């Protein structure tokens, strides 16, 4: 049984959440910064992800190799990731090595060096990462899609930055952003595993007792840049003309979620439409028709905006047919909701998956962190199961109807333009009828 996590606020504003799991032999420590790419001005675009690369380069006492050796010695692991709203770096260690994890956190948070030579080295690594992403059609399609639907809002920019923005970052900018955002009052430390709340609170006190070095009082922790709600996503049909064997197709609707219940329903709808090999769209488009290798749905949820998207990599000549299936299946949900038998199957799957995740300290840490960052609270496995079981067919119908009737969908296709005039005219007619906008053709 997963009991709710316990929370503590330190004098300097740092928040600690602890999930006690005495049955485990490990501990996961995650440091979450409430800052991501949406909080970057144009001059700092890409700096959050840049810091993800720099954070484990070490400090005054331990360099990058020292950190790696310390973690390897105990058979542990460490990693980091950046999203549009958060940055996380985390350690996975034997439960007896909690003190090591805290010492490493202190080193990288209190005394980072961000040496110029390391910045130059990681700059080249990130430029290669950007190039690699552009060469991955699926990732590139999603980046272009986010840019289209969020317009000029920072949420629409990709997380990595571009060549010009990365070349424009320097040590001064990296430190400025770090000191302004990597502050105790703007962070959450999540600990999950074989550790008591009192022990975790005692060990982490070194991070919570006083202001951190170079974080001067009165310096605003989080500027308002990027914090204005992005608003409803922009409808449209964008066709990016790119010669390839496969077409990449995204169909999405603005999908407001106003409560935890809505998030659960959204996840259920995602599972039903494109959550795996038993999903409706996977069965229809891949298994029955053989049009695609990859097809899935994705509930993209932020603090103040949500998008429900469906993606497929299909044969170029099947783009319009695929879009019609996407539109038809989503429209069908507005009339009938998810059939009771399918709903029961998905509810079982979600509950069992949740229970299986409790056997891993890192999964548990991610779960309690997400709950804290989005809802300021944690839920037990019993409460989660109860919430999932409470969803009825009529609930899925109501949310699907809210999404579909709330505005026109957004569509992006990365593919060669159809050669036949008649086929292109059919695509244009579909755009006008479904999205309420004219089809926009762009060069790759």
Residue ranges and their predicted role:
Residues 13, 20-71, 145, 182, ...:
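Active/ligand-binding-proximal structured segments within catalytic/core domains
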Residues 4, 9, 20, 64-216, ...:
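Charge-rich, well-structured scaffold segments of protease-associated domains
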Residues 21, 30-32, 218-280, 387, ...:
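His/Glu-based metal-binding/catalytic segments typifying zinc-dependent metallopeptidases
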Residues 25-27, 81, 195, 228:
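Active-/binding-site microenvironments in catalytic and ligand-binding cores
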Residues 14, 196, 277:
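A generic "binding-loop/recognition-motif" signal
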